[in-house]
C-alpha cells in the first residue's frame, strides 16, 4: 500500500487558511474546464471518423449538492397559503405558494452565496405578509457570524415581504419575531424589554414604530410576547428573579394587567376562548435557601441566604470551592431542617399547576396539578393550546401520571415506578372539565423528535406528528384527535416526511418530503383522499443537472459491537463493482450524538448534505457504511442514554469499530483501504478511529471534532482516557482537519491542540481553517472547496494503485 509522503517539518502538513491558499492540484472547476477543452480538441480531430457513444460523465459532488432544499415551512391560519425558506447553493430565499395550484413564488432576491442565514419564517393569518430573520444567532460573546469577514460587520434583523408582490424590506434589528395576526407589526425582545416594529417598507417616523425604543418597558425581564387572536392585546411573562408574572397589555389603553399575581413562577401564556382567557403554568417561587439576591445590608434588604452560601464556598462555587469572597475548602453552612425552607411546593406537596385566568378581571383558577413528588410531569415544557385542550409531551415512567391520571384517584399515593417508557408521549388535558385527566394521544411506539415534528390543525381538533413508528429507519406523518382516539398514519411508503403543516381549510397537509434518491422537497398532500397516491411536489420545480440515476438505494445492515449492542447502519454499494473486485470503503459517523441517519435524504441540512456526499462517494466507487452508533436517537431511550459513552467511557466507539470490521469482512471491500469521515461528534469518532485503530482506518476526514473530553489532563481520569488524546500515540494514519474559528458548538481550540500533538508525532495531516466561520460552514463555496480537498485526499490514501480482487492484486 502507498505510504504517506514524508516531508520536512515545514512541509509536513498541507495547510490551507482560506484567504492564503496553497493547493498542489488544480481546483475542480479549472480541472473540469481543462478536461472540456481537451475533449473538444479531440472531437475536432476525430470528428470525420465514426465514433462510439461516449459513456455518461460521472457526477461530481457539485451535482449531488446542487438542488434547492426547503428548510422550514409555515401555513397561514385563515388562508390556504404556505411560506418557506430555501437553500440554493448558498443562496437563502423565502418563497410562498397558495392553493389550488401551489405554484412557488420567490419573495426575496438574495442571489449571493453570502453566508447570511435565514430563519424564523412567519406568515400572517390571511397569508398576505411573511416575515423572517436574516443573520445568525450571536455567540457567547454576542458576536453574529460574519463568514465573509465583511468589514461593515454582521447584522441580525427582521425582514418582511408581501405575498402579493414587491421587494422584501428590512423591518428592524432583532430576532424571534412574533407577527401580529393581521401582519401589521412584529414583536421581539431585547435587553429584557418588548419592542414592536411596524411592518412597512416605508421607514416610520417614530422610534417606537421602528423597533428602536421599547414598546413595553416594565421592571424585571420581559419575555415570550404573544398576540391575542384579534391582535388587540399582548400576553407576556415578566420575571422578577424569585418569581414571575403573566401580564396582559391592552393596545387601546396602553395599560397592563397582572393575571392573578402571586409569589410563584408563572410562565407560558396561551390565549384561550378567543382572547377572553389566558392559560398559563405555575410553579412555586423560590424558598429562602435558594434566594441568592445581593442585598444592601439594611434590616429589610439583607443578602439572600443563597448569596451567603455562595460566598462561603457553597452555591455557585460548589462545596469546597471559593465563592466571591469565601476561602477555598470552606465548609458549607448548616441549614435548619424546616419544611419549606429548602424545597418549595404548593399545599399538598405538588409543584406544577395549570391555571386559567379571565383577562377582564385578572382572576385565575387552577385547572389541574401534578401529583406530590411527581418526577415526570414537572414542567409541561412546550405545551400548546388546542381549543379547550392543552397538548404537551412527557417522558413517562410506568404507572406514573398527574392528578386524575387514568386509573389514579386524586388522593391515592403514586403507584410504584415502572420501567421508563422508551418514547416520549403526547397528552391532552381538557380545560373545560371539572375533573380533568390527561389523556394519552400518541399510543404509537416511535420517536417524536422536537417541536418541528408536531402541529395542530387550524380548527384545533387534530394533532399531527412526525414519527418513525412502524418504520424505524424513516419518518412518516400520523394524526390523532386532540380529544383522544386512535392515531392513524397519513403518509406511507419509502419516503421521509417531516414538519407536518396543516393548511387552514383542513383539506391539505404540507410536509418536507424526501426518499432515497429524491432530495428534500416541499410536498402537499390532499387529506380527503389517499394522500400518498396524490402527493404533489411543490418545490423545487426543477432539479436540472441532479444525478438521479447515479443514486443507489441504501441497504439496512445490522452489526454487533463487542459488548453485544446491536447497531443499525446504511450500506451504499457502488453500481459498477465487478465480480471478485474489492473496493476501498469509507465509514460515515453522524454528529450530535442525538441524530439518526435514515434510508434516504435527511431532514436536517448538514445531514441532508452528508447523505448526498455518501451517495457521491458510492458513485466514485467507494463502499460506504453510515453508522447509527449508540447515544443516537430513533431506537428508544435506552439506546439514547446508553451507559459509559462520551467522556464517561467512549463506549460508542465500539460501534464504529464493529462497522469498520464488518467492512473488512465483505468480499467486495479491500480490507486495507478503509477510511472514515464525520463532523462534530462524527469528528470525535473519526479522530478516535485514527488514534485507536490506525491499523484498520487508513485515513480520515475530521470536521470540527472534539479531541479532549472535559478539561482534565490527568492520564488516569476517565474523561482523559475516553478522549482521542488519551490514545494519541497510536495515531499513525493521515487526516484532513477542517474547522471554522467562530465555531459555537465545538471550541476551535480542540483542533489547535490536536495539531500540536500530531506535529510532535510526525503524523501526516492536512488542515483547512475558515476564519470567521461557524460549526458548519455558512458558505456553499467553502463546502465545495472542502469536498474537492476531501476527494483528492481520499483518492491519495484510499484508492489503490492496483485493483484488488478476491484472487489478489492486479494491475
Question: What is each PLM-predicted segment?
Answer:
Residues 98-102, 162-166, 199-202, 250-254, ...:
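Short loop/turn segments that connect beta-strands within beta-propeller blades
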Residues 85-95, 110-117, 131-159, 167-176, ...:
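A flexible loop/linker signature enriched in serine peptidases of the S9 family
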